[in-house]
Amino acid sequence: MFKRWCTQQKFNNATNLSHVLMDGGVLSVPFDKLNEFHEKYIEAVKSGEKLFVVEQKSPRYNFFVDIDYKDTRSLTIEEIQDICKIICDKVKRHGGKDCLISVSPPKTVGQYTKTGVHLNWPEFVVDQPSAIALREHILVALSRAKGATDWNEIIDAAVYGDVRRKSKGSGFRMPWSHKMAKHMPCGGQGCEECEGKGKVVQVAYLPLFIYNHGPLSKLTKIDPQPNLDILKMSSIRTEQPQHITVEPPSSVIKEGSFTDAQTKDEIENDELKGLIEDFIQRNMEGQSTSVVTKLFK
């Protein structure tokens, strides 16, 4: 029903890509039709139709964060709230206001359990450099509050792209939309369990909280049922010509951020490297698969 309606509206002309359908197809929804598109989307979800929609970024877009937390257990709701409060408080200092927080039910990824969390700031418009800088500010805040975890691996960087490589990054799956993923047991080759498709449907992100940015900032629990106003909060596309400018923090938490002076004396000792790697895997939380590639003194 939803895809047929999109075709009737001639949204499938691919002239200015706005949405990708993970079950096949792309859409070009003009901004003056976005409200109608959102209304039809909610109508389809409420009717029980399974949708697979990933919204693509406009040149300037409403800021968002993608958390991919993998560990031997899933995050609790309390832990999710704690992490999101730290992130939202940091973004608030740079002009962010209310934030929509959506959560995907935990799923098994290899030997780990993945907890996915999406955060959306409506009308908090950024360009690519500012989005990347905001992520770095978030990494600093999380590392100070919860230093035992490698947040650089958890706060997805790929969604923002890379300025130097001129890559734009990915889009953002809409709330209540499912995901078509490779069926890992058969490696996507197709088997009896996945009915020969090689793919499985992964469940949707559901809105659970709103961060209220007032003087006493707090998280408010919300109804996860399909809701037009909540869907509009999650939209990343915008026509807004103005965007905020955020400079990177003075201390950036990312891999490979050492100076030339710090890396001029490399230690070539495989036995020592192995001992340090073993110590890290055994004693540092969340680092059970870490690999030591180089040592410097």
Indicate where each model-derived feature is located.
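Charged, compositionally biased non-catalytic regions
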Residues: 1-3, 122-138, 245-284
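Short beta-strand elements
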Residues: 95-105, 153, 159
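Well-ordered, non-membrane alpha-helical segments in soluble/globular domains
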Residues: 77-90, 131-148, 272, 276
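DNA replication initiation on ssDNA origins
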Residues: 1-84, 94, 157-161, 165-192, ...
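Ordered, helix-dominated protein-protein interaction surfaces in large eukaryotic regulatory proteins
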Residues: 67, 89, 93, 121-123, ...
